[in-house]
Each structure stands twice: as structure tokens, then as C-alpha cells.
A protein has these predicted regions:
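Membrane-interface helix-loop junctions and terminal tails of multi-pass membrane proteins
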Residues: 1-190
């Protein structure tokens, strides 16, 4: 169930985020224009619900290669276990992409001249790879620090309450970082 929870949480996170990106990037959609506040809320909700779903299903809700790598380095997670988490995350990314491609098929076909690069990937505002890497490290540090500090003691709560708090912390951390340490287009801690 742990592997399924990682897949499900990551799928919810990415499908929600990708769908919003499709809405603002493609023609013939309901939103059709970038609004930074909406973008922040959409990605924050996607992360919050992804974390909550994964947690409810009994998983640790890593949902991110950066978090898995951090557990390998800091917590002694084995390479084999890490590889399975990464596999679930990459499979979830592919499934979320496929669902969005199907859901927005007509919009993709109508958007021959629209920029599609940012739907399924992120890129920095200013391309400076060494600095961008450092920016990602800083954003990842803030994300992990906030999450770990805020969920201390959560294990003492009932399972449903744990999942709700974990989801809310994820929502809040992403919203905060999106409006502050975000120079690489929501790829922070990815």
C-alpha cells in the first residue's frame, strides 16, 4: 500500500498542477490567462491534496525526488527503497501527463502556436544554471525545514487529523515559497 500511496499522492499533485497549467497555456480553456495568485493557489492545493491522499493511504507522502534524496542522505534510506519511491513518482508523473493530454486533447490541437513548454516542466526566470541550482537548494531547505518543524508531534494525533494537518502544512509551505523563494517556476524542491 505504501507504493500505491506514493503513486496516488504524486498523481493527484501533478494532475492538479498540470491541469491548471493547461488551462492557462492552451487555447479553448476556461481560464486562458495567467494569474499569479491563482497559480499559487492551484499548485498549493495540488500539493496539499497530494500529501493528504498519500498520508491517508498510509504512506510517508514523499511525493518528490528531492525529498527521497534527502531521506537517502540524512535518514539512511536504502537505495533500493529510494528507487521504488522514485519509480512511483515518475510513473505518477507520466500518468498525470497522459490524463491531462487526454482531457485537454482538443485544446492541445487548437494551440499550435501556444507555448506548451511550461505545462509539464519548469524553467528559471533568468537562466544561470549554477545560481538556479543554488536557488533550488535554498527553496528545498526552506520547504523541508518548514514541513518537518510543522509536523513535529503530528504522529500523536488520529490518522485522519494527521493527514489533514500534513496537507495543510504542504499547502501553506508551497504558497509561502511560491510567493517568496520562487525563481524557477514551481520546480522548487523537485
Amino acid at each position: 500500500m505504501v507504493w500505491l500511496s506514493e503513486f496516488a499522492g504524486c498523481f493527484i499533485l501533478l494532475a492538479g498542477g498540470y491541469a491548471y497549467m493547461c488551462n492557462i497555456s492552451l487555447k479553448k480553456t476556461q481560464i486562458a490567462a495567467l494569474n499569479y495568485t491563482e497559480l499559487t493557489i492551484a499548485w498549493s492545493l495540488a500539493v496539499g491534496f497530494g500529501l493528504a491522499v498519500s498520508s491517508i493511504m498510509g504512506g510517508p507522502a514523499y511525493l518528490n525526488p528531492g525529498v527521497v534524496l534527502g531521506n537517502v542522505i540524512c535518514n539512511g534510506m536504502g537505495i533500493g527503497e529510494a528507487a521504488l519511491y522514485l519509480l512511483m513518482e515518475f510513473l505518477a508523473a507520466g500518468a498525470a501527463m497522459l490524463v491531462c493530454m487526454i482531457f485537454f486533447w482538443d485544446s492541445f490541437r487548437a494551440s499550435t502556436d501556444a507555448p506548451k513548454r511550461g505545462i509539464f516542466s519548469a524553467y528559471p526566470v533568468e537562466k544561470n544554471l549554477p545560481l538556479n541550482f543554488i536557488q533550488e537548494l535554498i527553496a528545498t531547505f526552506f520547504f523541508m525545514f518548514i514541513v518537518f518543524m510543522c509536523i513535529t508531534g503530528v504522529s500523536d494525533l488520529k490518522a485522519g487529523n494527521q493527514s489533514l494537518i500534513i496537507g495543510m502544512v504542504g499547502f501553506g509551505a508551497v504558497a509561502f515559497l511560491s510567493l517568496s523563494f520562487n525563481s524557477t517556476g514551481y520546480s522548487m524542491h523537485a
